[in-house]
Amino acid sequence: QPEVNLGLIPGYGGTQRLSHLIGKGRAMEYMMTGDMIQAEQAMGWGLVNQLYESKEEMLADAQRILQKIFTKAPLAIGQVIACVNGAFDPKTDGYQLEANSFSHLCKSADFREGTSAFLEKRQAQFSGK
């Protein structure tokens, strides 16, 4: 967190997010010393999902993950994003948002397709409806 070296603090919610992600003590240390969080440490704290040896390896894995996500129900993916983001918004009741999302998705064509495909042991063909 080098911002203090420039006479600044981490902006755009950085002080808040880092404190929630790695704890108050660690966040204070890194933000006040200006030390950088090393890749291995970031991995250990859950700040990153994976470490890569090369840009090419990272891009290939990103493509693999995206291709897997693209096979899932678009409405459900959208609601996962909204609910996880809601968990970090103090103005949002994340549990209520999740309940509303679940109820909404249970009425979708994608839910019917997903459950039918599961019972029929086939790959679902989601429509985003």
Predicted features and spans:
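A general structural signal for well-ordered alpha-helical segments in protein cores
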Residues: 15, 24-27, 59, 66, ...
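C-terminal long alpha-helix characteristic of the crotonase
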Residues: 39, 48-96, 126-129
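Structural motif
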Residues: 45-46, 121
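Acidic, divalent-metal-coordinating active-site segment for phosphoryl/phosphodiester hydrolysis
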Residues: 35-41
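CoA-thioester-processing core
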Residues: 1-31, 45, 61, 65
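Terminal peptide-recognition signature
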Residues: 18, 42, 80, 118
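Helix-loop "lid/cap" segments that line or gate small-molecule binding pockets
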Residues: 30-31, 42, 83-88, 101-106
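Terminal low-complexity tails and localization/encapsulation signals of metabolic enzymes
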Residues: 116-129
